[in-house]
Curated annotation (Swiss-Prot):
UniProt superkingdom: Bacteria
Family: Belongs to the heat shock protein 70 family.
UniProt organism field: Aliivibrio fischeri (strain ATCC 700601 / ES114) (Vibrio fischeri)
Record-given protein name: Chaperone protein DnaK 2
Cited NCBIfam families: PRK00290.1, prok_dnaK
Single Gene Ontology MF annotation: ATP binding
Protein backbone atom coordinates (compact mmCIF):
# COMPACT_ATOMS: atom_id res chain seq x y z
CA UNK A 1 0.00 0.00 0.00
CA UNK A 2 1.25 3.49 -0.88
CA UNK A 3 1.54 6.34 1.57
CA UNK A 4 -1.70 7.64 3.05
CA UNK A 5 -1.27 11.39 3.45
CA UNK A 6 -2.95 13.59 6.07
CA UNK A 7 -4.81 16.72 4.93
CA UNK A 8 -6.23 19.50 7.07
CA UNK A 9 -8.78 21.09 4.72
CA UNK A 10 -9.30 24.40 6.49
CA UNK A 11 -11.63 27.35 5.97
CA UNK A 12 -8.77 29.86 5.69
CA UNK A 13 -5.65 27.70 5.30
CA UNK A 14 -4.96 24.07 4.46
CA UNK A 15 -2.00 21.87 5.29
CA UNK A 16 -0.64 18.46 4.21
CA UNK A 17 1.61 16.05 6.12
CA UNK A 18 3.08 12.57 5.65
CA UNK A 19 4.58 10.08 8.05
CA UNK A 20 8.36 10.19 7.65
CA UNK A 21 9.50 7.08 9.52
CA UNK A 22 7.69 7.39 12.85
CA UNK A 23 7.37 11.18 12.71
CA UNK A 24 4.68 13.22 10.94
CA UNK A 25 6.20 15.82 8.63
CA UNK A 26 4.44 18.93 7.29
CA UNK A 27 5.25 19.53 3.62
CA UNK A 28 6.04 22.83 1.91
CA UNK A 29 4.06 23.72 -1.19
CA UNK A 30 5.45 25.00 -4.52
CA UNK A 31 5.65 28.53 -3.07
CA UNK A 32 7.75 27.27 -0.14
CA UNK A 33 4.96 27.67 2.43
CA UNK A 34 3.94 25.06 5.01
CA UNK A 35 0.29 26.12 4.82
CA UNK A 36 -1.73 26.92 1.71
CA UNK A 37 -4.42 29.61 1.66
CA UNK A 38 -7.81 27.99 0.94
CA UNK A 39 -8.41 30.52 -1.83
CA UNK A 40 -9.29 29.56 -5.41
CA UNK A 41 -9.33 32.02 -8.32
CA UNK A 42 -10.68 31.50 -11.81
CA UNK A 43 -8.97 33.64 -14.44
CA UNK A 44 -9.02 33.40 -18.23
CA UNK A 45 -8.40 29.70 -18.80
CA UNK A 46 -6.51 29.18 -15.53
CA UNK A 47 -7.34 28.10 -11.97
CA UNK A 48 -5.10 29.51 -9.23
CA UNK A 49 -4.90 28.07 -5.71
CA UNK A 50 -3.29 29.46 -2.55
CA UNK A 51 -1.07 32.54 -2.45
CA UNK A 52 -1.19 33.17 -6.25
CA UNK A 53 -5.01 33.29 -5.99
CA UNK A 54 -4.87 35.56 -2.95
CA UNK A 55 -2.47 38.00 -4.66
CA UNK A 56 -4.83 38.74 -7.57
CA UNK A 57 -8.02 38.92 -5.44
CA UNK A 58 -8.16 42.74 -5.40
CA UNK A 59 -8.47 42.95 -9.18
CA UNK A 60 -10.68 39.85 -9.56
CA UNK A 61 -12.98 39.74 -6.47
CA UNK A 62 -16.03 38.19 -8.17
CA UNK A 63 -14.05 35.16 -9.38
CA UNK A 64 -11.87 34.65 -6.30
CA UNK A 65 -13.49 32.15 -3.94
CA UNK A 66 -12.59 31.75 -0.25
CA UNK A 67 -14.10 30.28 2.96
CA UNK A 68 -15.89 27.65 0.82
CA UNK A 69 -15.83 25.29 3.81
CA UNK A 70 -18.60 27.46 5.31
CA UNK A 71 -20.84 26.37 2.40
CA UNK A 72 -19.86 22.71 2.08
CA UNK A 73 -22.82 20.37 2.64
CA UNK A 74 -25.16 23.28 3.32
CA UNK A 75 -28.52 24.45 1.94
CA UNK A 76 -28.93 27.77 0.13
CA UNK A 77 -31.93 28.79 2.27
CA UNK A 78 -29.94 28.47 5.49
CA UNK A 79 -29.94 31.75 7.42
CA UNK A 80 -26.14 31.71 7.87
CA UNK A 81 -25.59 31.14 4.13
CA UNK A 82 -27.93 34.06 3.46
CA UNK A 83 -25.80 36.20 5.80
CA UNK A 84 -22.64 35.14 3.93
CA UNK A 85 -24.24 36.20 0.64
CA UNK A 86 -24.32 39.79 1.94
CA UNK A 87 -20.60 39.90 2.79
CA UNK A 88 -18.99 37.70 0.13
CA UNK A 89 -17.76 39.47 -3.03
CA UNK A 90 -18.51 36.36 -5.12
CA UNK A 91 -21.95 34.98 -6.00
CA UNK A 92 -23.56 32.27 -3.87
CA UNK A 93 -26.40 30.67 -5.83
CA UNK A 94 -29.10 28.06 -5.29
CA UNK A 95 -28.51 24.67 -6.92
CA UNK A 96 -31.36 22.60 -8.39
CA UNK A 97 -31.28 20.36 -5.30
CA UNK A 98 -31.41 23.35 -2.94
CA UNK A 99 -27.72 23.28 -1.95
CA UNK A 100 -25.59 26.42 -1.70
CA UNK A 101 -23.33 26.63 -4.79
CA UNK A 102 -21.04 29.37 -6.04
CA UNK A 103 -20.64 31.09 -9.40
CA UNK A 104 -17.41 32.20 -11.06
CA UNK A 105 -16.76 33.16 -14.68
CA UNK A 106 -20.47 32.50 -15.36
CA UNK A 107 -20.19 28.87 -14.27
CA UNK A 108 -22.11 27.41 -11.30
CA UNK A 109 -20.09 25.06 -9.10
CA UNK A 110 -20.78 22.91 -6.05
CA UNK A 111 -18.76 23.61 -2.90
CA UNK A 112 -17.04 20.17 -2.99
CA UNK A 113 -16.01 20.88 -6.58
CA UNK A 114 -14.26 24.11 -5.49
CA UNK A 115 -12.72 22.55 -2.36
CA UNK A 116 -11.35 19.79 -4.59
CA UNK A 117 -8.99 22.38 -6.15
CA UNK A 118 -7.33 22.88 -2.74
CA UNK A 119 -7.14 19.11 -2.21
CA UNK A 120 -5.53 18.71 -5.65
CA UNK A 121 -2.79 21.16 -4.61
CA UNK A 122 -2.27 19.23 -1.35
CA UNK A 123 -2.06 15.98 -3.35
CA UNK A 124 0.48 17.51 -5.78
CA UNK A 125 2.58 18.87 -2.86
CA UNK A 126 2.78 15.36 -1.37
CA UNK A 127 3.56 13.74 -4.73
CA UNK A 128 6.41 16.20 -5.37
CA UNK A 129 7.92 15.31 -1.98
CA UNK A 130 7.42 11.53 -2.19
CA UNK A 131 8.26 11.18 -5.89
CA UNK A 132 5.28 8.88 -6.47
CA UNK A 133 1.55 9.08 -7.13
CA UNK A 134 -0.64 9.51 -4.05
CA UNK A 135 -4.23 8.27 -3.96
CA UNK A 136 -4.98 7.59 -0.28
CA UNK A 137 -5.70 10.35 2.22
CA UNK A 138 -7.09 10.99 5.68
CA UNK A 139 -8.99 14.29 5.59
CA UNK A 140 -10.01 16.18 8.72
CA UNK A 141 -13.31 17.94 9.41
CA UNK A 142 -14.62 19.96 12.36
CA UNK A 143 -15.86 17.59 15.08
CA UNK A 144 -19.28 19.22 14.88
CA UNK A 145 -19.65 18.64 11.12
CA UNK A 146 -22.87 16.78 10.35
CA UNK A 147 -23.57 13.86 8.06
CA UNK A 148 -24.08 16.05 4.96
CA UNK A 149 -20.88 18.03 5.50
CA UNK A 150 -18.84 14.84 5.98
CA UNK A 151 -20.33 13.36 2.80
CA UNK A 152 -19.54 16.56 0.88
CA UNK A 153 -15.93 16.50 2.15
CA UNK A 154 -15.54 12.91 0.91
CA UNK A 155 -17.02 14.01 -2.44
CA UNK A 156 -14.41 16.78 -2.67
CA UNK A 157 -11.68 14.17 -2.16
CA UNK A 158 -13.13 11.97 -4.87
CA UNK A 159 -13.28 14.92 -7.31
CA UNK A 160 -9.60 15.64 -6.48
CA UNK A 161 -8.64 12.06 -7.37
CA UNK A 162 -8.19 10.95 -3.77
CA UNK A 163 -9.55 7.87 -2.07
CA UNK A 164 -10.52 9.32 1.32
CA UNK A 165 -9.67 6.39 3.59
CA UNK A 166 -11.01 8.09 6.68
CA UNK A 167 -12.64 11.34 7.78
CA UNK A 168 -11.44 12.28 11.27
CA UNK A 169 -12.30 15.14 13.59
CA UNK A 170 -9.83 18.03 13.78
CA UNK A 171 -9.46 18.13 17.60
CA UNK A 172 -8.87 14.37 17.64
CA UNK A 173 -6.18 14.71 14.98
CA UNK A 174 -4.50 17.45 17.04
CA UNK A 175 -4.55 15.16 20.09
CA UNK A 176 -2.87 12.41 18.04
CA UNK A 177 -0.09 14.80 17.01
CA UNK A 178 0.34 16.00 20.60
CA UNK A 179 0.24 12.60 22.29
CA UNK A 180 2.30 10.51 19.90
CA UNK A 181 5.69 11.34 21.44
CA UNK A 182 4.46 11.45 25.05
CA UNK A 183 4.79 7.99 26.53
CA UNK A 184 4.07 8.99 30.15
CA UNK A 185 1.02 8.16 32.24
CA UNK A 186 -2.66 8.55 31.40
CA UNK A 187 -3.86 12.08 30.62
CA UNK A 188 -7.16 13.84 29.97
CA UNK A 189 -6.77 16.72 27.54
CA UNK A 190 -9.05 19.47 26.24
CA UNK A 191 -8.53 20.48 22.61
CA UNK A 192 -9.89 23.99 21.93
CA UNK A 193 -9.97 24.39 18.14
CA UNK A 194 -10.89 27.86 16.83
CA UNK A 195 -10.13 27.92 13.13
CA UNK A 196 -11.03 30.17 10.23
CA UNK A 197 -14.70 29.23 10.05
CA UNK A 198 -15.52 26.65 12.71
CA UNK A 199 -15.09 26.01 16.42
CA UNK A 200 -14.76 22.67 18.24
CA UNK A 201 -13.99 21.50 21.74
CA UNK A 202 -13.13 17.87 22.43
CA UNK A 203 -12.33 16.18 25.74
CA UNK A 204 -9.93 13.30 25.03
CA UNK A 205 -8.47 10.64 27.31
CA UNK A 206 -5.02 9.29 26.39
CA UNK A 207 -4.22 5.92 28.00
CA UNK A 208 -1.00 3.92 27.81
CA UNK A 209 -1.57 0.18 28.21
CA UNK A 210 1.24 -2.31 27.50
CA UNK A 211 2.95 0.06 25.08
CA UNK A 212 -0.26 0.84 23.14
CA UNK A 213 -1.69 4.34 23.21
CA UNK A 214 -5.46 4.69 23.19
CA UNK A 215 -6.96 8.06 22.27
CA UNK A 216 -10.59 7.99 23.42
CA UNK A 217 -12.85 10.97 22.79
CA UNK A 218 -15.10 11.37 25.83
CA UNK A 219 -17.21 14.26 24.52
CA UNK A 220 -17.27 16.84 21.77
CA UNK A 221 -19.20 20.05 21.11
CA UNK A 222 -18.88 23.13 18.95
CA UNK A 223 -20.24 25.76 16.62
CA UNK A 224 -19.89 25.26 12.86
CA UNK A 225 -20.23 28.95 12.06
CA UNK A 226 -17.77 30.58 14.44
CA UNK A 227 -14.18 31.30 13.46
CA UNK A 228 -11.54 33.76 12.31
CA UNK A 229 -13.68 34.88 9.36
CA UNK A 230 -16.27 36.19 11.85
CA UNK A 231 -13.54 38.07 13.75
CA UNK A 232 -12.35 39.56 10.42
CA UNK A 233 -15.90 40.61 9.51
CA UNK A 234 -16.32 42.51 12.79
CA UNK A 235 -13.16 44.50 12.02
CA UNK A 236 -14.15 44.99 8.36
CA UNK A 237 -17.55 46.39 9.42
CA UNK A 238 -15.83 48.74 11.90
CA UNK A 239 -13.38 50.04 9.25
CA UNK A 240 -16.17 50.54 6.68
CA UNK A 241 -18.30 52.32 9.30
CA UNK A 242 -15.42 54.65 10.32
CA UNK A 243 -14.72 55.46 6.65
CA UNK A 244 -18.40 56.23 6.02
CA UNK A 245 -18.50 58.57 9.05
CA UNK A 246 -15.46 60.44 7.74
CA UNK A 247 -16.11 60.44 3.98
CA UNK A 248 -19.86 59.74 3.65
CA UNK A 249 -19.20 56.83 1.27
CA UNK A 250 -20.37 53.25 1.90
CA UNK A 251 -17.62 50.95 0.59
CA UNK A 252 -19.89 47.87 0.74
CA UNK A 253 -21.14 48.71 -2.75
CA UNK A 254 -17.59 48.55 -4.16
CA UNK A 255 -16.27 44.93 -4.44
CA UNK A 256 -12.69 46.00 -5.27
CA UNK A 257 -12.52 48.33 -2.27
CA UNK A 258 -14.05 45.66 0.00
CA UNK A 259 -11.41 43.14 -1.08
CA UNK A 260 -8.66 45.60 -0.09
CA UNK A 261 -10.37 46.30 3.25
CA UNK A 262 -10.69 42.54 3.88
CA UNK A 263 -6.96 41.99 3.31
CA UNK A 264 -6.07 44.99 5.50
CA UNK A 265 -8.39 43.82 8.31
CA UNK A 266 -6.88 40.33 8.32
CA UNK A 267 -3.37 41.82 8.44
CA UNK A 268 -4.32 44.25 11.24
CA UNK A 269 -5.91 41.45 13.30
CA UNK A 270 -2.69 39.41 13.06
CA UNK A 271 -0.51 42.43 13.94
CA UNK A 272 -2.63 43.17 17.02
CA UNK A 273 -1.73 39.77 18.48
CA UNK A 274 1.77 41.14 19.10
CA UNK A 275 1.29 44.95 18.98
CA UNK A 276 -0.99 47.21 21.02
CA UNK A 277 -1.91 49.41 18.03
CA UNK A 278 -1.80 49.35 14.24
CA UNK A 279 -2.71 51.65 11.36
CA UNK A 280 -4.99 50.53 8.53
CA UNK A 281 -3.75 52.69 5.68
CA UNK A 282 -5.36 52.22 2.24
CA UNK A 283 -4.58 55.04 -0.23
CA UNK A 284 -6.96 55.50 -3.17
CA UNK A 285 -9.44 53.01 -1.70
CA UNK A 286 -12.23 54.66 -3.72
CA UNK A 287 -13.15 57.94 -5.43
CA UNK A 288 -16.10 60.23 -5.99
CA UNK A 289 -16.73 63.45 -7.94
CA UNK A 290 -14.40 65.39 -5.62
CA UNK A 291 -11.48 63.04 -6.24
CA UNK A 292 -9.75 59.99 -4.71
CA UNK A 293 -10.42 58.93 -1.11
CA UNK A 294 -7.97 57.32 1.32
CA UNK A 295 -8.61 55.17 4.37
CA UNK A 296 -6.49 55.79 7.46
CA UNK A 297 -7.86 54.28 10.67
CA UNK A 298 -5.98 53.62 13.91
CA UNK A 299 -7.03 50.35 15.57
CA UNK A 300 -5.93 49.41 19.09
CA UNK A 301 -5.89 45.91 20.54
CA UNK A 302 -8.50 47.05 23.09
CA UNK A 303 -10.80 48.20 20.25
CA UNK A 304 -10.48 44.88 18.42
CA UNK A 305 -11.18 43.01 21.67
CA UNK A 306 -14.32 45.07 22.29
CA UNK A 307 -15.52 44.24 18.75
CA UNK A 308 -15.10 40.46 19.15
CA UNK A 309 -15.53 39.82 22.88
CA UNK A 310 -18.99 38.26 22.44
CA UNK A 311 -17.56 35.82 19.85
CA UNK A 312 -14.87 34.68 22.30
CA UNK A 313 -17.45 34.29 25.09
CA UNK A 314 -19.72 32.35 22.68
CA UNK A 315 -16.94 29.77 22.34
CA UNK A 316 -16.98 29.11 26.11
CA UNK A 317 -20.56 27.77 26.19
CA UNK A 318 -19.73 24.54 24.28
CA UNK A 319 -16.83 23.98 26.74
CA UNK A 320 -19.32 23.75 29.62
CA UNK A 321 -21.54 21.30 27.71
CA UNK A 322 -18.58 19.10 26.67
CA UNK A 323 -17.27 18.89 30.25
CA UNK A 324 -20.76 18.02 31.54
CA UNK A 325 -21.17 15.34 28.83
CA UNK A 326 -17.77 13.87 29.78
CA UNK A 327 -18.81 14.03 33.46
CA UNK A 328 -15.60 15.89 34.34
CA UNK A 329 -14.68 19.09 36.17
CA UNK A 330 -12.06 21.58 34.92
CA UNK A 331 -9.69 20.33 37.66
CA UNK A 332 -9.59 16.89 36.01
CA UNK A 333 -8.19 18.27 32.73
CA UNK A 334 -4.44 17.57 32.59
CA UNK A 335 -3.54 19.69 29.55
CA UNK A 336 -5.21 22.27 27.34
CA UNK A 337 -4.22 22.40 23.65
CA UNK A 338 -5.03 25.34 21.38
CA UNK A 339 -5.54 24.62 17.67
CA UNK A 340 -6.43 26.95 14.79
CA UNK A 341 -4.89 30.29 13.81
CA UNK A 342 -7.45 32.37 15.71
CA UNK A 343 -6.14 30.95 19.03
CA UNK A 344 -3.05 33.17 18.57
CA UNK A 345 -5.18 36.11 19.72
CA UNK A 346 -4.14 37.00 23.30
CA UNK A 347 -7.74 37.52 24.38
CA UNK A 348 -8.69 33.99 23.28
CA UNK A 349 -5.70 32.52 25.14
CA UNK A 350 -6.56 34.51 28.29
CA UNK A 351 -10.26 33.52 28.33
CA UNK A 352 -9.45 29.82 27.79
CA UNK A 353 -6.78 29.91 30.53
CA UNK A 354 -9.26 31.61 32.85
CA UNK A 355 -11.92 28.96 32.11
CA UNK A 356 -9.65 25.95 32.70
CA UNK A 357 -7.59 27.55 35.47
CA UNK A 358 -4.36 26.73 33.63
CA UNK A 359 -2.30 28.03 30.71
CA UNK A 360 -2.54 26.15 27.42
CA UNK A 361 0.50 24.21 26.21
CA UNK A 362 2.83 26.05 23.85
CA UNK A 363 4.47 23.01 22.23
CA UNK A 364 1.68 22.44 19.69
CA UNK A 365 1.71 24.37 16.40
CA UNK A 366 -1.91 25.55 15.98
CA UNK A 367 -1.66 25.61 12.17
CA UNK A 368 0.05 22.25 11.66
CA UNK A 369 -1.08 19.91 14.46
CA UNK A 370 -4.27 18.80 12.71
CA UNK A 371 -2.54 17.75 9.45
CA UNK A 372 0.18 15.97 11.46
CA UNK A 373 -2.46 14.01 13.39
CA UNK A 374 -4.19 13.09 10.12
CA UNK A 375 -0.85 11.75 8.83
CA UNK A 376 -0.53 9.62 12.00
CA UNK A 377 -4.01 8.17 11.38
CA UNK A 378 -2.94 7.54 7.77
CA UNK A 379 0.01 5.57 9.17
CA UNK A 380 -2.35 3.57 11.40
CA UNK A 381 -4.59 2.69 8.42
CA UNK A 382 -1.57 1.78 6.25
CA UNK A 383 -0.22 -0.47 9.01
CA UNK A 384 2.92 1.64 9.54
CA UNK A 385 1.84 2.66 13.06
CA UNK A 386 0.78 -0.30 15.17
CA UNK A 387 0.60 0.93 18.76
CA UNK A 388 -2.07 3.64 18.42
CA UNK A 389 -5.84 3.14 18.78
CA UNK A 390 -8.24 5.99 18.07
CA UNK A 391 -11.81 5.95 19.46
CA UNK A 392 -13.84 8.90 18.17
CA UNK A 393 -17.48 9.83 18.78
CA UNK A 394 -20.54 11.19 17.00
CA UNK A 395 -21.34 14.81 18.01
CA UNK A 396 -25.14 14.62 17.69
CA UNK A 397 -27.82 11.97 18.28
CA UNK A 398 -29.53 10.05 15.44
CA UNK A 399 -33.10 8.74 15.56
CA UNK A 400 -36.43 8.40 13.77
CA UNK A 401 -39.79 10.12 14.09
CA UNK A 402 -42.37 7.99 15.90
CA UNK A 403 -46.09 8.34 16.69
CA UNK A 404 -47.05 11.74 18.02
CA UNK A 405 -44.13 13.60 16.42
CA UNK A 406 -41.54 12.32 18.88
CA UNK A 407 -37.88 11.74 17.99
CA UNK A 408 -36.89 8.28 19.23
CA UNK A 409 -33.09 8.13 19.48
CA UNK A 410 -31.26 5.03 18.29
CA UNK A 411 -27.72 6.43 18.62
CA UNK A 412 -27.02 8.96 21.40
CA UNK A 413 -24.55 11.85 21.00
CA UNK A 414 -20.96 11.13 22.11
CA UNK A 415 -21.32 7.42 21.22
CA UNK A 416 -18.00 5.87 20.11
CA UNK A 417 -17.94 5.19 16.36
CA UNK A 418 -18.26 3.01 14.35
CA UNK A 419 -21.48 1.80 15.97
CA UNK A 420 -24.66 -0.06 15.11
CA UNK A 421 -28.06 0.12 16.80
CA UNK A 422 -31.43 -1.43 16.04
CA UNK A 423 -34.89 -1.17 17.50
CA UNK A 424 -38.23 -2.75 16.62
CA UNK A 425 -41.21 -0.52 15.84
CA UNK A 426 -44.76 -1.23 14.67
CA UNK A 427 -47.64 0.29 12.72
CA UNK A 428 -49.93 3.07 14.00
CA UNK A 429 -53.03 2.08 11.98
CA UNK A 430 -54.92 -1.15 11.29
CA UNK A 431 -54.01 -2.87 8.00
CA UNK A 432 -51.20 -0.40 7.32
CA UNK A 433 -49.30 -1.65 4.24
CA UNK A 434 -46.38 0.81 4.32
CA UNK A 435 -44.37 2.81 6.85
CA UNK A 436 -42.28 5.95 6.33
CA UNK A 437 -38.93 5.94 8.11
CA UNK A 438 -38.07 9.59 8.83
CA UNK A 439 -34.40 9.91 9.88
CA UNK A 440 -33.45 12.79 12.21
CA UNK A 441 -30.30 14.28 13.76
CA UNK A 442 -30.36 16.42 16.89
CA UNK A 443 -31.12 16.53 20.61
CA UNK A 444 -34.76 17.70 20.92
CA UNK A 445 -37.64 15.36 21.86
CA UNK A 446 -39.98 17.02 19.36
CA UNK A 447 -39.14 15.78 15.86
CA UNK A 448 -39.84 19.11 14.12
CA UNK A 449 -37.08 20.83 16.13
CA UNK A 450 -34.47 18.37 14.85
CA UNK A 451 -33.04 18.25 11.35
CA UNK A 452 -34.53 15.89 8.82
CA UNK A 453 -31.70 13.93 7.19
CA UNK A 454 -33.98 12.03 4.84
CA UNK A 455 -36.88 9.58 4.67
CA UNK A 456 -37.83 6.42 2.84
CA UNK A 457 -40.78 4.02 2.66
CA UNK A 458 -40.95 0.32 3.55
CA UNK A 459 -43.84 -1.11 1.54
CA UNK A 460 -45.56 -4.48 1.21
CA UNK A 461 -46.32 -4.98 4.91
CA UNK A 462 -48.94 -7.73 5.42
CA UNK A 463 -52.33 -6.37 6.59
CA UNK A 464 -52.66 -6.73 10.36
CA UNK A 465 -54.11 -4.87 13.36
CA UNK A 466 -52.02 -1.91 14.45
CA UNK A 467 -49.16 -2.77 16.75
CA UNK A 468 -48.82 -6.31 15.33
CA UNK A 469 -46.24 -5.96 12.47
CA UNK A 470 -42.61 -5.97 13.58
CA UNK A 471 -40.49 -3.39 11.73
CA UNK A 472 -36.80 -3.59 12.62
CA UNK A 473 -34.95 -0.31 12.02
CA UNK A 474 -31.13 -0.48 11.99
CA UNK A 475 -28.76 2.49 12.13
CA UNK A 476 -25.18 1.81 11.04
CA UNK A 477 -22.80 4.72 11.70
CA UNK A 478 -19.38 4.22 10.12
CA UNK A 479 -15.96 5.42 11.29
CA UNK A 480 -16.35 8.57 9.15
CA UNK A 481 -19.53 9.48 11.04
CA UNK A 482 -21.70 8.79 7.97
CA UNK A 483 -25.05 7.04 8.50
CA UNK A 484 -26.69 4.09 6.74
CA UNK A 485 -30.26 3.18 7.68
CA UNK A 486 -32.27 0.04 6.92
CA UNK A 487 -35.82 -1.06 7.78
CA UNK A 488 -37.00 -4.67 7.63
CA UNK A 489 -40.44 -6.23 8.00
CA UNK A 490 -39.76 -9.33 10.11
CA UNK A 491 -42.85 -11.14 8.77
CA UNK A 492 -42.11 -10.82 5.04
CA UNK A 493 -38.34 -10.24 5.17
CA UNK A 494 -38.78 -7.18 2.93
CA UNK A 495 -36.00 -4.65 3.49
CA UNK A 496 -35.26 -1.09 2.41
CA UNK A 497 -31.92 0.73 2.85
CA UNK A 498 -30.76 4.34 2.55
CA UNK A 499 -27.43 6.13 2.79
CA UNK A 500 -28.18 9.65 3.95
CA UNK A 501 -27.38 11.97 1.04
CA UNK A 502 -25.49 15.26 1.30
CA UNK A 503 -28.53 17.30 0.20
CA UNK A 504 -30.26 16.37 3.45
CA UNK A 505 -27.65 17.72 5.83
CA UNK A 506 -28.09 20.05 8.76
CA UNK A 507 -27.77 23.78 8.47
CA UNK A 508 -25.03 25.42 10.49
CA UNK A 509 -27.44 27.45 12.63
CA UNK A 510 -29.42 24.35 13.53
CA UNK A 511 -26.31 22.35 14.35
CA UNK A 512 -24.71 24.99 16.60
CA UNK A 513 -27.93 25.55 18.52
CA UNK A 514 -29.22 21.98 18.92
CA UNK A 515 -27.55 20.85 22.11
CA UNK A 516 -27.86 24.27 23.75
CA UNK A 517 -31.52 24.44 22.70
CA UNK A 518 -32.13 21.02 24.20
CA UNK A 519 -30.64 22.24 27.50
CA UNK A 520 -32.66 25.45 27.44
CA UNK A 521 -35.89 23.73 26.45
CA UNK A 522 -35.97 20.83 28.90
CA UNK A 523 -39.26 22.04 30.42
CA UNK A 524 -40.87 22.56 27.03
CA UNK A 525 -39.72 19.09 25.94
CA UNK A 526 -41.14 17.52 29.13
CA UNK A 527 -44.52 19.18 28.54
CA UNK A 528 -44.48 18.06 24.92
CA UNK A 529 -43.73 14.47 25.97
CA UNK A 530 -46.64 14.54 28.42
CA UNK A 531 -48.94 15.93 25.70
CA UNK A 532 -47.90 13.19 23.25
CA UNK A 533 -48.47 10.53 25.93
CA UNK A 534 -51.98 11.91 26.55
CA UNK A 535 -52.71 11.93 22.78
CA UNK A 536 -51.47 8.34 22.40
CA UNK A 537 -53.57 7.18 25.38
CA UNK A 538 -56.60 8.90 23.83
CA UNK A 539 -55.92 7.14 20.51
CA UNK A 540 -55.64 3.76 22.24
CA UNK A 541 -58.84 4.39 24.21
CA UNK A 542 -60.79 5.31 21.07
CA UNK A 543 -59.41 2.33 19.12
CA UNK A 544 -60.08 -0.14 21.97
CA UNK A 545 -63.60 1.18 22.64
CA UNK A 546 -64.61 0.99 18.96
CA UNK A 547 -63.38 -2.61 18.85
CA UNK A 548 -65.42 -3.47 21.98
CA UNK A 549 -68.56 -1.88 20.45
CA UNK A 550 -68.18 -4.22 17.44
CA UNK A 551 -67.62 -7.26 19.66
CA UNK A 552 -70.59 -6.41 21.93
CA UNK A 553 -72.96 -6.24 18.97
CA UNK A 554 -76.65 -6.31 19.95
CA UNK A 555 -75.79 -6.89 23.63
CA UNK A 556 -75.05 -3.15 23.91
CA UNK A 557 -78.27 -1.13 24.36
CA UNK A 558 -78.82 1.59 21.75
CA UNK A 559 -78.86 4.43 24.31
CA UNK A 560 -75.53 3.24 25.82
CA UNK A 561 -74.00 2.98 22.33
CA UNK A 562 -75.13 6.53 21.54
CA UNK A 563 -73.61 7.82 24.80
CA UNK A 564 -70.26 6.08 24.11
CA UNK A 565 -70.10 7.32 20.50
CA UNK A 566 -70.76 10.89 21.70
CA UNK A 567 -67.86 10.54 24.19
CA UNK A 568 -65.60 9.21 21.38
CA UNK A 569 -66.53 12.19 19.18
CA UNK A 570 -65.81 14.64 22.03
CA UNK A 571 -62.38 13.07 22.60
CA UNK A 572 -61.55 13.09 18.88
CA UNK A 573 -62.30 16.83 18.76
CA UNK A 574 -59.73 17.67 21.47
CA UNK A 575 -57.00 15.05 21.01
CA UNK A 576 -55.22 16.88 18.18
CA UNK A 577 -55.05 20.10 20.20
CA UNK A 578 -52.36 21.24 22.65
CA UNK A 579 -54.52 21.19 25.81
CA UNK A 580 -53.33 18.14 27.75
CA UNK A 581 -55.87 18.69 30.57
CA UNK A 582 -58.77 18.69 28.08
CA UNK A 583 -57.51 15.47 26.47
CA UNK A 584 -57.14 13.79 29.89
CA UNK A 585 -60.65 14.93 30.94
CA UNK A 586 -62.33 13.66 27.74
CA UNK A 587 -60.38 10.36 28.00
CA UNK A 588 -61.76 9.90 31.54
CA UNK A 589 -65.28 10.72 30.31
CA UNK A 590 -64.98 8.06 27.62
CA UNK A 591 -63.78 5.53 30.20
CA UNK A 592 -66.85 6.32 32.36
CA UNK A 593 -69.18 6.09 29.36
CA UNK A 594 -67.68 2.74 28.33
CA UNK A 595 -68.42 1.06 31.72
CA UNK A 596 -71.36 -0.83 30.17
CA UNK A 597 -69.00 -2.32 27.55
CA UNK A 598 -66.76 -3.65 30.35
CA UNK A 599 -69.78 -5.32 32.01
CA UNK A 600 -70.82 -6.95 28.72
CA UNK A 601 -67.25 -8.17 28.09
CA UNK A 602 -67.10 -9.68 31.62
CA UNK A 603 -70.47 -11.41 31.20
CA UNK A 604 -69.32 -12.90 27.88
CA UNK A 605 -66.06 -14.09 29.47
CA UNK A 606 -67.92 -15.73 32.39
CA UNK A 607 -70.34 -17.44 30.03
CA UNK A 608 -67.40 -18.75 27.98
CA UNK A 609 -65.68 -20.07 31.14
CA UNK A 610 -68.86 -21.90 32.13
CA UNK A 611 -69.04 -23.52 28.70
CA UNK A 612 -65.36 -24.51 28.83
CA UNK A 613 -65.75 -26.03 32.32
CA UNK A 614 -68.21 -28.58 30.92
CA UNK A 615 -65.59 -29.90 28.48
CA UNK A 616 -62.69 -32.26 29.32
CA UNK A 617 -59.41 -30.47 28.56
CA UNK A 618 -57.17 -32.24 26.07
CA UNK A 619 -53.86 -33.51 27.52
CA UNK A 620 -50.69 -32.32 25.81
CA UNK A 621 -47.54 -33.99 27.09
CA UNK A 622 -45.35 -31.64 25.08
CA UNK A 623 -46.39 -28.51 26.95
CA UNK A 624 -44.23 -27.58 29.94
CA UNK A 625 -44.95 -24.66 32.24
CA UNK A 626 -41.78 -22.66 32.75
CA UNK A 627 -40.71 -19.33 34.08
CA UNK A 628 -38.56 -17.20 31.80
CA UNK A 629 -36.48 -14.10 32.23
CA UNK A 630 -35.92 -11.62 29.41
CA UNK A 631 -32.22 -10.92 28.93
CA UNK A 632 -31.56 -7.57 27.31
CA UNK A 633 -28.39 -6.81 25.38
CA UNK A 634 -26.17 -4.50 27.34
Amino acid sequence: MGKIIGIDLGTTNSCVAVLDGDTPRVLENAEGERTTASVIAYTDGETLVGQPAKRQAVTNPQNTLFAIKRLIGRRFEDEEVQRDIEIMPFKIVKADNGDAWVEAKGQKMAAPQVSAEVLKKMKKTAEDFLGEEVTGAVVTVPAYFNDAQRQATKDAGRIAGLDVKRIINEPTAAALAYGLDKKGGDRTIAVYDLGGGTFDISIIEIDNVDGEQTFEVLATNGDTHLGGEDFDNRLINYLVSEFEKEQGINLKNDPLAMQRVKEAAEKAKIELSSAQQTDVNLPYVTADATGPKHMNVKVTRAKLESLVEDLVLRSLEPLKVALADADLSVDEITDVILVGGQTRMPMVQAKVAEFFGKEARRDVNPDEAVAMGAAVQGGVLAGDVKDVLLLDVTPLSFGIETMGGVMTKLIEKNTTIPTKADQTFSTAEDNQSAVTIHVLQGERKQATYNKSLGQFNLEGIQPAPRGMPQIEVTFDLDADGILNVSAKDKATGKEQKITIQASGGLTDEEIEAMVQEAEANKDADKKFEELVTARNQADQMIHGTQKQIEEAGDALPADEKEKIEAAIKALEEVKSGNDKEAIDAKTQELMQAAQKLMEIAQQKAQAQQGADAGEQPKQDDDVVDAEFEEVKDK
